[in-house]
Amino acid sequence: MNEKYKHFPACHVVFPPKCEERRAAFYLAAEEYVAETFNEGNYIFTWQLSPTCVFGRNQIPHSELDINFCNQNGIDLCRRKSGGGTIFADRNNIMISLITPACDVESLFAEYAEMVSSGLRKLGAPTMVSGRNDIILEDGRKVCGNAFYHQANRNIVHGTMLYGTDVEKMIGALTPDKAKLESKGVVSVKSRIGELKEYLPFDVTTLRSRLITMLTDKSLELSEEDIKSIEELEQTYY
């Protein structure tokens, strides 16, 4: 293993095919389940969603989202247990979940972000790490953001990677504080969004597969009993 990367390659958590199209709450519950059940080693899995807005544990949905727009456009809503801002995801995004033993959060974020960014550069996208938890293109547009929380003596990092997205739906759903955007020199949500499809000569399914190849070297297949336990945990999300 490369000494630079203490948590990679990780073990790929494989879901049964019937779990490919679930709501966000299912996959967030799966993170918890893996953290609580497999208490040694590093695990990673990817997932995709129908149009969904996921907001942080301390956020007020009506302050972050146009709820009427979401309802009218079939956009699901889910609160995660980590902090951070509200994100919009659809089938052209890749969600990444990393579960590791408890460790220094700053170093984990740095390692994870650099590992992913380095992999994207090898695939042809001119990315770099920005701040603690973002990956951006060389022109400053954001293509990946990440959040973290602690569960059962484990660290859980989850990220959203923008291969492409329905920008108009995203803009309609999200209502960020304009003053906060301006303080960061951002004119609008749209101006800050980058899409990896501009640089990669393959589709989102291929990108997802290549990420797993880059980040893992073994796999763990979840059983039907595992899925039932995850579905029970899913009920704790709203």
Where are these regions (language model features)?
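Short, glycine/charge-rich beta-strand/loop segments that flank catalytic centers
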Residues: 48-53, 130-139
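Short, conserved charged micro-motifs
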Residues: 63-65, 103-109, 169, 204-206
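Short, hydrophobic/aliphatic alpha-helical segments
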Residues: 65-78, 146
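A glycine-rich, hydrophobic loop/mini-helix early in the fold
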Residues: 72-94
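Contiguous, small/hydrophobic- and glycine-enriched helical/loop subdomains that border
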Residues: 91-133
